[in-house]
């Protein structure tokens, strides 16, 4: 049976804006209050996804969340009509309104952690939505995320959906952005790397001083248990707290893996050599550990360009390619390194550049925009086929974006009652296009 790694990219929602909500994410903070272009953002995301589909990759799309989130605003005491709720929030608590309008679900690397059936004791594909408790604007996502994942991977014979972890900082979980999987072939049992920022229950363990560590060891271990992984299938690695304090808020900003390749910065981890040795012990295959030295690419350049927030994909030919943002081309040190990388003896043979600037300005590169799901042929056939990106779906989604999305959105526009109507109309139509059923609060 054939095995694949599919990518499920997040559709950018109609309220994509720059409110600077993500403390610890340098790009998000630096671009706060810029005027955004939701239409361009959605089309850039679709274009990147379609390019991967055209390369022969299995590519799916995940629907965005309902925003503005009036349910949350009502839950915290705003009342009256939809327009009155928005007006009150804008006047007395604009930061809360901004949080309830974020289109951050576009970064599906934070949607969930996924373990393929080759790794799990029950032979099913397991999904656990991330609780994202560290950030208010993301902590309101998990319930709808779970519904969207269940409507996308909708055959219980193949797919097992867990609830998100308890909503407490001890179980802070940011999903696949802190998880990668190494293997020989996608269908073989692999080693799942869980990267965490701190041990919540150990006050003496190292942790960052300036920015929060969003992922805890306790959360990573809970997911490994839920997903029925054996100890031999797991390696738990602490991210270097010093790089978290330099803006590396998720591991996918400083490392990325695919099959037998781990591409990472010299400063990415604590106890790096011991952990690489553990991976070698647990995964008996030829491995390529590509360590990028600080002397060639500084942490600052890595964060600014999102060198590691790239996708490494295995093309149908068997060669690997890096999917990089154009920001990597524009950074001399990073561009020079990527050109050098192609001359090294590794499976990575090409770099393809994509413009995802609307996402990048909010602190999310190509890897943030996708959730990886390793699947066999039967599992691919069991997915809701209306979520897989074909030429027809690409055209339909582009037309849908053109019809419903604004090309200009400022934070002041978030209080416009018309935005609620536009957003709900768009999402209602999207659930019909993608055959998702009633996943949104306004539909229930």
Swiss-Prot record:
It catalyses: N(2)-succinyl-L-arginine + 2 H2O + 2 H(+) = N(2)-succinyl-L-ornithine + 2 NH4(+) + CO2. It comes from Shewanella oneidensis (strain ATCC 700550 / JCM 31522 / CIP 106686 / LMG 19005 / NCIMB 14063 / MR-1). Substrate binds at residues 19-28, 110, 137-138, 214, 252, 362. This is N-succinylarginine dihydrolase. Homodimer. One of its GO terms (biological process) is arginine catabolic process. The keyword Hydrolase applies. The active site is at residues 174, 250, 368. Pathway: Amino-acid degradation; L-arginine degradation via AST pathway; L-glutamate and succinate from L-arginine: step 2/5. Keywords: Arginine metabolism, Hydrolase. It is an enzyme of class 3 (hydrolase).
């Amino acid at each position: 049976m054939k095995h694949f790694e599919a990518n499920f990219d997040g559709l950018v929602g109609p309220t994509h804006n720059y409110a600077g909500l993500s403390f610890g994410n340098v790009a998000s903070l630096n671009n706060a209050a810029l005027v955004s272009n939701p239409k361009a953002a959605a089309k850039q995301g679709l274009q990147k996804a379609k390019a991967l589909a055209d390369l022969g990759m299995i590519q799916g799309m995940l629907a965005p969340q309902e925003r503005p989130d009036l349910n949350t605003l009502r839950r915290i005491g705003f009342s009256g009509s939809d327009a009155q709720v928005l007006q009150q929030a804008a006047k007395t608590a604009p930061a809360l309104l901004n949080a309830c309008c974020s289109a951050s679900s576009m970064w599906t690397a934070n949607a969930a952690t996924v373990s393929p059936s080759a790794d799990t004791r029950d032979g099913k594909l397991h999904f656990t939505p991330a609780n994202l408790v560290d950030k208010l604007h993301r902590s309101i996502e998990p319930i709808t995320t779970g519904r969207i994942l269940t409507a996308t991977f909708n055959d219980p014979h193949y797919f097992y959906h867990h609830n998100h972890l308890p909503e407490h900082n001890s179980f802070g979980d940011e999903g696949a952005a802190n998880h990668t999987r190494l293997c020989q072939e996608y269908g073989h049992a692999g080693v799942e790397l869980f990267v965490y920022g701190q041990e919540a229950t150990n006050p003496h363990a190292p942790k960052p001083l300036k920015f929060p560590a969003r992922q805890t060891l306790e959360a990573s271990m809970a997911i490994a248990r839920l997903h029925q992984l054996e100890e031999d299938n797991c390696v738990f690695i602490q991210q270097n707290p010093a790089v978290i304090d330099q803006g590396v808020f998720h591991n996918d900003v400083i490392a990325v893996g695919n099959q037998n390749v781990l591409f990472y910065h010299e400063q990415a981890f604590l106890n790096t050599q011991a952990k690489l040795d553990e991976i070698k012990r647990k995964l008996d295959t030829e491995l390529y550990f590509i360590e990028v030295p600080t002397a060639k690419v500084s942490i600052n350049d890595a964060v600014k360009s999102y060198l590691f927030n790239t996708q490494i994909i295995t093309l149908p030919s068997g060669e690997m390619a890096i999917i990089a943002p154009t920001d990597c081309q524009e950074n001399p040190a990073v561009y020079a390194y990527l050109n050098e990388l192609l001359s090294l003896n590794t499976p990575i043979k090409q770099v393809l550049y994509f413009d995802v600037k609307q996402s990048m300005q909010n602190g999310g590169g190509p890897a943030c925009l996708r959730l990886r799901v390793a699947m066999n042929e039967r599992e691919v056939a069991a997915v809701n086929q209306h979520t897989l990106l074909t030429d027809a779906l690409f055209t339909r989604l582009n037309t849908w974006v053109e019809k419903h999305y604004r090309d200009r959105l400022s934070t002041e526009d978030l209080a416009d009652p018309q935005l609620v109507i536009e957003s709900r109309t768009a999402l209602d139509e999207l659930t019909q296009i993608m055959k998702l059923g009633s996943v949104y609060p306004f539909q229930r």
